[in-house]
Amino acid sequence: MANVDKAIVFGMRAFHCGIVSPNEYIADYVKTHPEKLIGFAAVDPMQDNVHEVLEHAIDDLKLRGVKLAPIYQNIHPLDDRMWPVYEFCEKRNLPILIHQGTTFPRKAPLKYSLPILLEDVAMKHPDLKMIIAHMGHPWIDETIVLIRKQPNFYADISALHYRPWQFYNALTIAKEYGVMRKLLFGSDFPFTNPDATMEALHNFNKMTEGTNLPKLPVEEINNLIHSPTLEYLELA
């Protein structure tokens, strides 16, 4: 943690896929470096006690955001059971980090993972802050047009750099649509780490050396690395 100023940490709560991280574990981890770590709560809207889990995580454990993963939880983002979570987070000014993109478990339904499904959420809860993880890959275009039109929607770049062509297209299209400032730095640790993500950003333009393909201005790259995530999410 020596080289880290601030980091958001979280687990996942998806009983359908057998991934259940106790929020108490995250809260205890935050206590090891309270000046550097911000914890998010993981909730599974498929569980009947989701409201109790939310209240305990926020009020008792002092976690400051919420992690959702509809594709892992086997639930449509617009399912009736999702709306109380959105409403709770909007009222409490809690940002939601949502995995709205592909994944590898066979039992995780892709039909629930399209980023464009979140447009109705943004329309009904305009003050809700939401971050689409991994830019919603491979449906990156949907994510970009969504965050362009919704002021409180963002996307993070975690877990993209080890797919170089997708990484290149994602940032290039984001630049063309004028939404680079809506992209947040992320690593997807432990699958990769912040150093690897920063190295990929610093080497971004090397991918197209010797070609006429567009380059990304160094200033844009540096702005992404130093994106004011905590200010955007009101967590500073």
Q: Model-found features: residue ranges?
A:
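Mid-to-C-terminal alpha-helical segments outside catalytic/metal-binding sites
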Residues: 1-2, 6, 55-56, 177-184, ...
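Short, well-ordered alpha-helical microsegments
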Residues: 23, 50-51, 139-143, 167, ...
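A generic secondary-structure signal
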Residues: 2, 28-32, 56-60, 120-121, ...
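Catalytic cores of Mg2+-dependent Asp-rich isoprenoid enzymes
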Residues: 188
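Catalytic pocket-lining loop regions of alpha/beta-barrel enzymes
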Residues: 64-65, 78-185
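Acidic catalytic loop of the alpha/beta-hydrolase fold
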Residues: 162, 191-192
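Active-site gating/metal-coordination segments in enzymes
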Residues: 3-112, 153
